[in-house]
A protein has these predicted regions:
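Phosphate-binding loop of NTP-binding sites
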Residues: 2-164, 168-177, 242-251, 305
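Short, conserved phosphate/pyrophosphate- and ester-handling motifs at nucleotide-, phospho-/glycolipid
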Residues: 43, 240, 286-290
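Residue-level detection of beta-strand-connecting loop/turn positions
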Residues: 57, 71-73, 225, 280, ...
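Short, small-residue-rich loop/turn micro-motifs
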Residues: 62-67, 184-185, 398-400
Length: 425
């Protein structure tokens, strides 16, 4: 019965997509649309590509988890990728406002539900693939196949740009029609070649076809070799910067100008967003809500941590969502923090304390000595501030740009950055 329901829904989604395209005059064909998919890094990549494009003087649109933008008009986002009718309407409005480029996040849910069927993409970017959304996809293979579907729909003329250092970076582009390109660090992956970088000097990109069988380990001659500087912190942002610069190059943007813009660009709201308090505490808010993302931001925090100081993390796991990542994230938080405060993160219909108990499943008695459990997120943040001293780092993870908390079906205002600033004032 469930299978029949899913098939009926799929047919219905496809019909809606076709009708919407017909009604609005197939607006995506009048735009240069670049989609970004992957578990982490989508928002940063599309937002900065949008900022670069507008800084270069083009009119552009943005469709992201944080917000949708038509030229400069901001429209609240309700989901990562809108339904097919809302999406087509957005494209039509972008066309009417003179947009030439659009940068959009493409979620696995959207791909599974056919929300982007028929969209005229000129390029697609793959960031990475790690544990997430298994409550929806049921297993990792289904999650991967949903992501792969995006690249299978790209036309011959489009580019497909993939993270060669990700274990799925090559596999996700197998058998596709579009032109293949890779980016990454050659010290980690043979497909990469020396080129651009955000925090390191050994980053690069390469055309999948290569140029010749030169003597380097990949058998590929570098397409370019340059250094890129950016304010964005962490290896995960180095990969984002690589994807951004490589995509900009593929779109034909002026490289020197792109590098200049990238050097001074700020991260999107809630993506490793930070400030230093008057008491000398570095406070960071990040959207990290997957095991991989949490580990990345904590490693970055450890990389900038001063001697004899502490990292205090505050995070939880969403209710009515993938329960398998809860013990994994709990362990990651403890390993990479001096003090880990487990708290609520949109518990929705679940008991917050029960979620926290699941986060503790993999912890030893020694691990538990580093853990505090405070289900009230506001009180958890206050406790972190109380424990922090000059030079310490507080990371509040999981919600990022979100300005709400959902508890027992009730959605109320809650903003991690607001709470941190208030507590540290």
């Amino acid at each position: 019965m469930k299978l029949l329901t899913k098939k009926f829904k799929t047919i219905w989604w496809r019909i809606k997509s076709v009708v919407a395209r017909y009604y609005y005059g197939n607006p995506s064909k009048k735009l240069k649309i670049v989609g970004v998919t992957g578990t982490n890094g989508k928002t940063t990549t599309v937002t900065i590509l949008y900022k670069i494009t507008t800084a270069l003087g083009y009119k552009a649109g943005l469709i992201s988890t944080v917000e949708n933008i038509i030229v400069a008009e901001k429209i609240p986002a309700t989901m990562t990728t809108p339904d097919s009718v809302s999406l087509t309407k957005l494209f039509a409005e972008m066309v009417s406002k003179g947009c030439e480029y659009v940068f959009m996040e493409v979620s696995s849910h959207a791909l599974d539900q056919g929300r982007v069927n028929g969209v005229n993409f000129v390029g697609g970017i793959f960031t990475n693939l790690t544990h997430d959304h298994l409550d929806y996809h049921k297993n990792f293979e289904n999650y991967f196949l949903a992501k792969k579907r995006f690249f299978q729909m790209l036309p011959l003329s489009a580019f497909a740009l993939s993270n060669a250092d990700d274990s799925y970076g090559e596999k996700i582009l197998e058998g596709i029609k579009a032109r293949k390109f890779f980016y990454g660090f050659p010290a980690r992956n043979a497909f990469s070649t020396p080129a651009s970088n955000a925090s390191r000097n050994d980053a690069g990109w390469a055309d999948a076809g290569g140029k010749n069988n030169s003597s380097n380990s990949s058998g590929r001659e570098p397409d370019f070799s340059e250094k890129i500087e950016t304010k964005l912190l962490g290896d995960f942002n180095a990969y984002n910067a690589l994807a951004i610069f490589s995509a900009s190059k593929l779109l034909g943007f002026r490289e020197e100008k792109v590098k200049e813009i990238l050097k001074n660009i700020e991260p999107p709201r809630g993506r490793f967003e930070y400030f230093t308090s008057d008491s000398g505490v570095l406070a960071i808010v990040d959207y990290a809500h997957t095991p991989d993302a949490l580990e990345n931001v904590l490693r970055t925090a450890n990389g900038i941590k001063k001697e004899n100081t502490k990292i205090i993390s505050v995070f939880g796991c969403g209710g009515d969502r993938d329960p398998y990542k809860r013990p994994v994230m709990g362990k990651i938080g403890v390993i990479n923090s001096d003090i880990a405060i487990f708290t609520s993160d949109n518990p929705r219909g679940e008991n917050p304390d029960a979620i926290i108990e699941q986060m503790k499943i993999n912890l030893s008695q020694e691990d538990l000595q580093k853990v505090k459990t405070i289900s009230n997120r506001r009180e958890a943040i206050k406790e972190a501030v109380k424990l922090a001293q000059n030079g310490d780092i507080i990371l509040v993870a999981g919600k990022g740009h979100e300005d709400y908390q959902i508890i027992k079906g009730v959605k109320s205002h809650f903003d991690d950055m607001e709470e941190l600033k208030r507590a540290l004032a």
